[in-house]
Amino acid sequence: MHNLSAQPWQAKMANLTYDNVTLSNRSEVAIQPPTNYKTVELVFIATVTGSLSLVTVVGNILVMLSIKVNRQLQTVNNYFLFSLACADLIIGVFSMNLYTVYIIKGYWPLGAVVCDLWLALDYVVSNASVMNLLIISFDRYFCVTKPLTYPARRTTKMAGLMIAAAWILSFILWAPAILFWQFIVGKRTVHERECYIQFLSNPAVTFGTAIAAFYLPVVIMTVLYIHISLASRSRVRRHKPESRKERKGKSLSFFKAPPVKQNNNNSPKRAVEVKEEVRNGKVDDQPSAQTEATGQQEEKETSNESSTVSMTQTTKDKPTTEILPAGQGQSPAHPRVNPTSKWSKIKIVTKQTGTESVTAIEIVPAKAGASDHNSLSNSRPANVARKFASIARSQVRKKRQMAAREKKVTRTIFAILLAFILTWTPYNVMVLINTFCETCVPETVWSIGYWLCYVNSTINPACYALCNATFKKTFKHLLMCQYRNIGTAR
């Protein structure tokens, strides 16, 4: 948390001289920070800070509009980013410009009431930003470490409650103390032309707030991201693509064979074997007939009995699919084979290896002695295989989309955490130094470090665009006024 109590000129107050009067820390004298900038420097400062404020406002408005108009961006994680963009927008509109006025003028020209309101707004918004980052980090951590239980509770309503809690808690922590401390202690000790938090005038107290508001959250977020990264790498290793040689050796195929019909004169029927390979959701027919008795014609299937399919995808090559007669309500966990059904059982195995998915289906023939009604044809199993192939293809596509989405989220989180740490660390290091040496940090360095905290709000929208192609395309559509397909841009 950046802190206005540690302004660079405050450390020099004991030695300032105005009108041949040596001043100490006396509350009855109005002390104002010296203005050491030349006119050219003031113009440069105003231009740079004004440009940063404009870019911050435009960038965060783009983020908010993108999430609003593009359905692809309306996810729980992006709602957290929406909250963060709101905080950054407030900083761009108010905090940046008021602090620029303070720097250029060399003193606070707007009075005590505006000063306290600015400080309260600045601290509440900054604390809300940190808490939003913590929420994003914890949310991603639970998504990775508890993928089976946490997503069920990860609803839009829950996200809204967490965001509201972050803002309300930030307001309770800072606003009352900043606005009413002078009434609690009975007097205002902040000089008329200065603006800082009265109860943080002690450098040791300032450092304590920096520990609680910056260093501790940074440690927590870093630890969480390390766990997120390790869990993601573990997933990659688990689904690492095999070599070509291994894939050839482990090729899964789909075999189905109709049972041999037993008739009255014990003459065997022709057994037909159809081999179909299912790779990446595509079926390739390779029929081959093996005739056991010549002169016999293949038996056609005439029954129109329908069946329902219950499928559970697994790895480790474990068959988990069965076909049950229509109308049966057995649980897939306890399947039951109907002896009068045309098909006794279908086994399906889907093996996911990195970006390649291989599906194998096996139709187990009916038991010996089954009636003529239980024979299988060539065409019906092939149609079923294609249906399963379509399901497998759809599942692979969904997995790839989910993996790409997770990669975007993780990359975005890393970018905004890195930007937060890089921009907020210099100032908070100076706060640490100022605790032990009040005159060691030059005025200009203080101002630059303090402004870097604000620059974080400028960088965040760029992080979203660089790490998420959907954000980038939506930004482009909004800036170029191309609204036709903006709602579904990917």
Swiss-Prot record:
GO cellular component: plasma membrane; postsynaptic membrane
Regions of compositional bias (Polar residues) in chain numbering: 287-296, 304-314
Matches recorded under InterPro entries: GPCR_Rhodpsn, GPCR_Rhodpsn_7TM, Musac_Ach_M4_rcpt, Musac_Ach_rcpt
CDD domains (alphabetical): 7tmA_mAChR_M4
Glycosylation sites: 3, 15, 20, 25
Keywords from the UniProt entry: Cell membrane, Disulfide bond, G-protein coupled receptor, Glycoprotein, Membrane, Phosphoprotein, Postsynaptic cell membrane, Receptor, Synapse, Transducer, Transmembrane, Transmembrane helix
Membrane-traversing stretches: 43-64, 79-99, 117-138, 159-181, 204-226, 413-433, 448-467
MF terms in GO: G protein-coupled acetylcholine receptor activity; G protein-coupled receptor activity
Topological relation to the membrane, as annotated: Multi-pass membrane protein
Function description: The muscarinic acetylcholine receptor mediates various cellular responses, including inhibition of adenylate cyclase, breakdown of phosphoinositides and modulation of potassium channels through the action of G proteins. Primary transducing effect is inhibition of adenylate cyclase. May couple to multiple functional responses in cell lines.
Protein name: Muscarinic acetylcholine receptor M4
